[in-house]
Amino acid sequence: MRNWRWLLLVLAVLLAWLQYRFWFGPGNSGEVMMLEAQVAHQTQDNEGLRQRNQALAAEVKDLKDGEAAIEERARSELGMIKPGETFYRVVEDAPLPAPASPEAPAPPQQAPEPIDPVDHP
């Protein structure tokens, strides 16, 4: 019976030591959760960068292989036109200010201040 008590005491101490290491020791559960969150955030960042890289790779391939992409870029970014083409630019009129309604009072006018003459010797 006495051996059982010692065995139970040793197992309780071992369990307490393992619990301490789980909650407070190196590599504890808090650190693991923090690292898992960092990994999830980095995975999300990597996916965004992977999509960006794929788009850039497709654009580079298109620029290397096709003339249509080069022509489009020259037209849109550099304003170039083909020989014999006429370029028309449509400029929209700026909206006119709304006329003052007759019910609204006109803003008060300030009279200009008189200028003091300065005597120069």
UniProtKB/Swiss-Prot annotation:
GO annotation, cellular component aspect: cell division site; cell septum; plasma membrane
rRNA processing is among the record's keywords: no
Keyword annotations: Cell cycle, Cell division, Cell inner membrane, Cell membrane, Coiled coil, Membrane, Transmembrane, Transmembrane helix
Topology, Cytoplasmic side: 1-6
Pfam families according to UniProt: DivIC
Superkingdom assignment: Bacteria
PANTHER family to which the protein is assigned, alphabetical: CELL DIVISION PROTEIN FTSB
Quaternary organization: Part of a complex composed of FtsB, FtsL and FtsQ.
Protein name: Cell division protein FtsB
Record organism: Xanthomonas euvesicatoria pv. vesicatoria (strain 85-10)
Gene: ftsB
